[in-house]
Design a protein with these regions (language model features):
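Conserved ABC ATPase signature
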Residues: 92-96, 100
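H-loop (His-switch) and adjacent beta-strand-loop-beta switch element
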Residues: 165-173
Length: 173
């Protein structure tokens, strides 16, 4: 499986196929049992886990965004607007709905300005409009040379935004 510069590659597969495990291996969280992973620069990859609660350590959504933007308030607030989070800036991240939590996690990852994004079901819990906003933002990032490997069950999102898709069955692409 090769991820090219500026590409949005969606990885599809059933439950238990190994999609999340593959992302964890690519991000360095897990070691592969066999095979190997070749990186241009491993430190240039950002990982969005399926369970995003572990990403939040601050008291407010705004503080989380500022943390992701290295204190750049203009960038943080711009991302809040893009991800429809402006109405929640003073709320605690744990008080958000599932879709709002996903948007905050995606926003925080996107603010990290990584060259490779590994995203595990980022559209989970999002409404159609917010998925479209995320898809457009991801396409914009790809046009800037950022590569994205995105795990999803959302065929419509894949058809609308992916350059390519790969299928994973029992750990095999």
């Amino acid at each position: 499986l090769t991820l090219y510069k500026g590409e949005l590659l969606c990885l599809l597969g059933g439950n238990g196929a190994g999609k999340t495990t593959l992302l964890k291996i690519l991000s360095g969280i897990k070691k592969p049992w066999r095979g190997n992973v070749k990186y241009v620069r491993k430190e240039s990859a950002g990982y969005l886990p399926q369970n995003t609660q572990s990403m939040f350590i601050k008291d407010t959504v705004k503080e989380e965004l500022l943390d992701g933007a290295d204190g750049d308030e203009a960038r943080a607030l711009d991302m809040a607007e893009q991800m429809e989070l402006t109405g929640f800036l003073m709320r605690h991240p744990y008080d958000l709905s599932g879709g709002e939590t996903q948007r905050l996690a995606a926003a925080k990852l996107l603010l990290g300005q990584k060259k490779v994004l590994l995203m595990d079901e980022p559209t989970k819990g999002m409404d159609a409009w917010t998925k479209e906003q995320l898809g457009r933002h991801l396409r914009k990032l790809c046009s800037q040379g950022i590569s994205i490997l995105l795990v999803t069950h959302d065929l419509d999102f894949t058809a609308a935004y992916a350059d390519r898709c790969a299928m994973l069955f029992d750990g095999m692409v």
